[in-house]
Curated annotation (Swiss-Prot):
Entry GO terms, CC: endoplasmic reticulum; Golgi apparatus; vacuolar membrane
Residues in compartment: Lumenal: 30, 169-188
Enzyme nomenclature, EC number: 2.3.1.225
Transmembrane feature ranges: 9-29, 31-51, 148-168, 189-209
UniProt name for this protein: Palmitoyltransferase PFA3
Length: 325
């Protein structure tokens, strides 16, 4: 039973390493249409980057509110009765509340949930800015490892496309030279061509979709729950008696460049290499750039701030009435 439980964990890692190394060996030994210097440069650049980004995604992890002692709930009963509250630094900058207007918390993890934090049923744990659960790694993609995950997709897409082009070129040359009259077609080359063609289509499409989401500063989960976010904004508008403004994503910073930088960093070096962003390194001794709170659309922020102030006054009045009674 113990061995069976390790299969979902070890199989994706072994398969990823196996495919990367197998493709590199076949390209080096069987493809002859391109010089060894170029071939070696590409292989020695992309394969290590792919494996490094892959294992960095796993090692770094998505990040969890459980990593912060300040977010742990002491008594769930006190939370439910309104006797225990989230820390001030979190409450002051949180914009997404539950349907009752209270700060979100997780009963299973016994922790206060920051904006964009969600509980994964597969991992049975809350993760910061959770994007999705990916069996390929295996685990969740979240705030801390999202950048490494996207780097893996970018490197793997380029590598698959390179293999597809080179193997196609080699096969075309082989057929045009009528080599089939003298020798059999190499089965490893054909298999690699088929795998690379399929991987190019799948990885490029998935990579493009994730880049699209990053440029909108939106996670996969938020993309699916967009209607819920709009409902929250409508609720805030109702509380303030203001006009209803529909904003597709309140975390959209207004430009693709700013949204991209929020995840991938500000410089070309950060965009191209699987390294931590400069902003996260500078703020490593504070709660900034830790996935606990985020910049949001200014219009949405103003409206949400008004609604939160109103909700605070209403809660105070409600508690005062209860105390009198």
């Amino acid at each position: 039973m113990h061995i069976c439980s390790l299969i979902p964990i070890l199989f994706p890692k072994l398969l990823t390493c196996g495919l990367a190394l197998y493709s590199a060996v076949v390209l080096w030994l069987k493809v002859s249409v391109i010089g060894s210097f170029i071939q070696g440069t590409v292989l020695l650049t992309l394969v290590p980057l792919i494996l490094y980004a892959y294992f960095s995604t796993i090692a770094v992890g998505p990040g969890s509110p459980l990593d912060f002692e300040e977010l742990r709930i002491r008594d769930l009963n006190d939370v439910e009765t309104g006797m225990e509250f989230p820390p001030d630094f979190l409450a002051a900058k949180t914009v997404t509340l539950d349907s009752t207007g209270r700060h979100r918390y997780c009963v299973k993890c016994k922790v206060w949930k920051p904006d964009r934090c969600h509980h994964c049923s597969a991992c049975d744990k809350c993760y910061l800015r959770r994007d999705h659960h990916c069996v390929w790694f295996p685990g969740c993609i979240g705030y801390n490892n999202h950048k490494f995950f996207l780097h893996f997709l970018l490197y793997a897409s380029v590598y698959a496309f390179w293999i597809c082009i080179i193997t196609t070129w080699d096969l075309v040359v082989w057929f045009r030279a009528h080599s089939y009259e003298r020798e059999l077609l190499n089965v490893h080359l054909v298999c690699l061509w088929a795998l690379s063609a399929a991987a190019t289509v799948a990885l490029t499409a998935f990579c493009a979709f994730n880049i699209y989401l990053v440029c909108k500063n939106e996670t996969t989960g938020e993309y699916q729950r967009r209607s819920t976010l709009n409902s929250d904004l409508e609720m805030y508008a109702d509380c303030t008696n203001g006009p209803r403004t529909v904003i597709e994503n309140p975390f959209d910073l207004g430009s693709r460049r700013r949204n991209w930088a929020a995840v991938m960093g500000d410089t070309w070096k950060e965009w191209l290499l699987p390294i931590r962003t400069t902003a996260s390194q500078k703020a490593r001794h504070s709660f900034d750039e830790s996935g606990l709170y985020f910049k949001i659309d200014e219009q949405a922020h103003a409206k949400l701030a008004e609604s939160m102030a109103l909700q605070a006054r209403l809660i105070t009045r409600f508690n005062s009435k209860r105390a009198v009674q």
